[in-house]
Amino acid sequence: MILKQQDITQQKPFVDASVTTTWTIDLHYPEKPACACDAFQSVAKQLRISPYPIPYRCLYSRNIDNLMMAGRNISVTHVALGTVRVQRTTGMMGEVLGMAASLCKKHDCTPREVYRQHLDELIAIMTEGVPTRRVTPSGRTIGASE
């Protein structure tokens, strides 16, 4: 799935809503060539939005079975990228993909199969959030000590 400007501005609901972002659609364009200003100057155009969720389906590859992405390489259009590209949002993508990776390991499945077969479980983990202490699949305890 490719997230588009219309999905954002029309607040399209997604069953696999994963990361919520509130950043404006923030697009930067170079100054007109006739500008006598610094060559690296640009013009920013910002379109305010309401908070919206990025679908989990934007965070894995459509043609490479075991590839997940967090950051500027997710499945979005140029305009939609203007709002998902900030560090706080990309960091949250990483958290969601860590959760999805744990389900891939647990169920011996691909990221796409997490969406198709284990979405309720992923949503439950996302709702719980990132714990400070957890037991890994190998039985090791990680995180803050009590």
Regions found by a protein language model. Name each.
Residues 1-146:
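Flavin (FAD/FMN)-binding glycine-rich loop and adjacent Rossmann-like elements that form
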